[in-house]
Amino acid sequence: MVSKPHGGKLVRRLVAERTRERILSEQKEYPSVKIDHGRAIDLENIAHGVYSPLKGFLTSDDFQSVLDHMRLSDDTPWTIPIVIDIVEKTFDEGDAVLLYYEDIPIARMHVEEIYTYDKREFAQKVFKTTDPNHPGVAKVYSLGKYLVGGEIELLNEVPNPFAKYTLRPVETRVLFKERGWRTIVAFQTRNAPHVGHEYVQKAALTFVDGLFINPVLGKKKKGDYKDEVIIKAYETLFEHYYPKNAATLATVRYEMRYAGPREAIHHAIMRKNFGATHFIVGRDHAGVGDYYGPYEAWDMFENFPDLGITPMFIREAFYCRKCGGMVNAKICPHPKEFHVRISGTKLRKMIMAGEQPPEYMMRPEVYEVIRSFEKPFVE
């Protein structure tokens, strides 16, 4: 069986077309709030149930409960505060406001609460640091004085150049059932696949019916693979190296918080809402720099026996010259001098230099796809 949505019911915060047209015709009558791309994507994820059971941005009770207990105030597991900020009060509690991204009215929000918060507490409890060099902490420090809680209704979506690769939770659940998959393992990625990824995915697929590759599309940093490269590389990998109907790919737009262990739980909840029953938790999952231990995220799952999705902890793969193949530390008896770690950074440098990686690092078909792009990396 595909998993039950988090909280028991898949949230849908969409409005009928007639209602939408009426709201848009009256938009000048509403107070307005400008939002950034990340909040616009959060709105989409709330509206389509990716963040079920959230129906909007957190009120103060839920916000504080997430900080203190990693649960909503009704005790549902939830680890990342999904919030929207304002610099000053230009509307009141009880008002309805329109949220705009680049002059597009994305959603109507019913303001339940406007509240203050402690930025250092937010940073310390979510990211385990108050260091402004941490990108998540820097984001928190840039927020306005107030947070606004309340339910939302989606009016428009941010233009998506990869819409044909996007499936919502209501659609993936139908897809999994049509394929006859009772157990599904999800894999989150922001990279084109190398052989180490393939090893981990196939190790997980051994124990379930289907593999759900769910690339995260969104804000990129210099040197990252472009979104279209990731998608085409996976399509090629599926074509040549995966059993037919054993794997599928759909993208999700999401702004990484880099909250390490807490965000690993959040990622699992998102995939649970897509219908996955299992979730691959990687080494230093959702980490950045040296803020978190390499397997700290694994330990975090022990706090959530009621999460409703099974984590799969698969050790990092490497090539062993003695074994003659991809292995991990649990199954390879040979010393480190025989091991070749597959570094994503090293692979990118090789590709940038026009050097084809050896086949034990990257499938040649995948390399050819990457090479077919004039500029495969973000500049």
UniProtKB/Swiss-Prot annotation:
Pfam family, one: PUA_2
Catalytic activity from the UniProt record: sulfate + ATP + H(+) = adenosine 5'-phosphosulfate + diphosphate
Keyword presence, Nucleotidyltransferase: yes
Domain of life per record: Archaea
EC number: 2.7.7.4
GO MF annotation, one: sulfate adenylyltransferase (ATP) activity
Keyword ATP-binding set for record: yes
Keywords: ATP-binding, Nucleotide-binding, Nucleotidyltransferase, Transferase
Pathway: Sulfur metabolism; hydrogen sulfide biosynthesis; sulfite from sulfate: step 1/3
GO biological process, one term: sulfate assimilation
Family label: Belongs to the sulfate adenylyltransferase family.
Name of the protein this chain belongs to: Sulfate adenylyltransferase
